[in-house]
C-alpha cells in the first residue's frame, strides 16, 4: 500500500490525557484510521533522516528485535538498523 498526501483526510499528533508519549492518528479519505505510537514515528523519522541526509546511502532497513537486557526506560522491542 502506498499512501499519497491526497489519500490523507486528517493527521493528528497529540499526547492523550493520562499518557506520556505522543500518538499520531492518520485518517484516510476512505475512512480507514491508523494510530501510531511515538516509537513507531520516531523510527520512521530516524530512517528517513538517515537516508535523506547521508551522502551515498540510499536505503536503510530497521528490523524488530527483542532485548532482554537494556537501559532503563527503553522498551524490550526495538527496531534496529540491519547490518
Report the location of each language-model feature.
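N-terminal acidic leader/helix
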Residues: 2-32
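Polar/charged, Gly/Pro-rich intrinsically disordered segments
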Residues: 65-83
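Acidic, low-complexity, intrinsically disordered interaction modules
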Residues: 34-71
Amino acid at each position: 500500500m502506498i499512501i499519497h498526501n491526497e489519500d490523507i483526510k486528517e493527521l493528528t499528533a497529540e499526547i492523550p490525557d493520562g499518557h506520556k508519549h505522543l500518538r499520531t492518528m492518520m485518517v484516510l479519505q476512505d475512512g480507514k484510521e491508523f494510530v501510531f505510537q511515538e516509537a513507531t514515528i520516531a523510527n520512521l523519522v530516524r530512517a528517513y533522516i538517515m537516508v535523506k541526509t547521508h551522502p551515498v546511502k540510499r536505503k536503510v532497513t530497521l528490523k524488530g528485535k527483542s532485548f532482554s537486557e537494556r537501559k532503563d526506560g527503553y522498551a524490550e522491542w526495538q527496531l534496529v538498523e540491519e547490518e
